């Protein structure tokens, strides 16, 4: 069994917001397996322990562009190493120009985007020059483009959350949808779009919690299904309560406005990226080695 160190307990607490003693107990039960300990906490403490999915550490910015005719748009994520660089005007300008380039040139992937003409060189040579000027690594992580006969709306929150929405209806509806998505971070439009692995994971947790109730099997089955359906309502856009009027779901709001939504793209900076960290002693040793 792996040693249950204070650092391991601290890491689990930061991932889950669970009490320190509960983290230690979970790690002991999981024999030091961090992922298993997190699952144990979810069963014991409920969905508060799922905050790990939303905790990200990579820095960078989201860029958005919508053409003047409102028929094509793009969202892009570009990462850097520190928040300080994310506020650099050259970095911001680079991202905004990349978003426009994606919308107008429709590259197939990051490699194709990197090869496109940009200024006096290419996107890649410009990126390399910017790395040299700023002194930090910069990477184009992902982008998505939408071309539509309908309408597009976008919203960026603090440069860290970006939303692009394809919809039909009044301009105000598009703005409301984009802001709502940024606030609630749905996984999909409806249940059909939710990743099967996410549903399976939620069902597994629900089954373990329901089994601990000691109730008859038929009741346990209903409890599990109820938990899964509740999860799906929480993470699917059309089922969510509208943030500006929680007495309506998004689906009801759209029907009332005579509007519809076809697609949305949601990017959160650093989502799914784990930033490598070193303990203080290691940092001092590395610095000393660098001076030697």
Curated annotation (Swiss-Prot):
<keyword id="KW-0251">Elongation factor</keyword>
<dbReference type="InterPro" id="IPR014039">
    <property type="entry name" value="Transl_elong_EFTs/EF1B_dimer"/>
</dbReference>
<feature type="region of interest" description="Involved in Mg(2+) ion dislocation from EF-Tu">
    <location>
        <begin position="82"/>
        <end position="85"/>
    </location>
</feature>
<dbReference type="InterPro" id="IPR018101">
    <property type="entry name" value="Transl_elong_Ts_CS"/>
</dbReference>
<dbReference type="InterPro" id="IPR009060">
    <property type="entry name" value="UBA-like_sf"/>
</dbReference>
<dbReference type="InterPro" id="IPR001816">
    <property type="entry name" value="Transl_elong_EFTs/EF1B"/>
</dbReference>
<keyword id="KW-0963">Cytoplasm</keyword>
<comment type="function">
    <text>Associates with the EF-Tu.GDP complex and induces the exchange of GDP to GTP. It remains bound to the aminoacyl-tRNA.EF-Tu.GTP complex up to the GTP hydrolysis stage on the ribosome.</text>
</comment>
<dbReference type="Pfam" id="PF00889">
    <property type="entry name" value="EF_TS"/>
</dbReference>
<dbReference type="GO" id="GO:0003746">
    <property type="term" value="F:translation elongation factor activity"/>
</dbReference>
<dbReference type="InterPro" id="IPR036402">
    <property type="entry name" value="EF-Ts_dimer_sf"/>
</dbReference>
<protein>
    <recommendedName>
        <fullName>Elongation factor Ts</fullName>
    </recommendedName>
</protein>
<comment type="similarity">
    <text>Belongs to the EF-Ts family.</text>
</comment>
<dbReference type="GO" id="GO:0005737">
    <property type="term" value="C:cytoplasm"/>
</dbReference>
<keyword id="KW-0648">Protein biosynthesis</keyword>
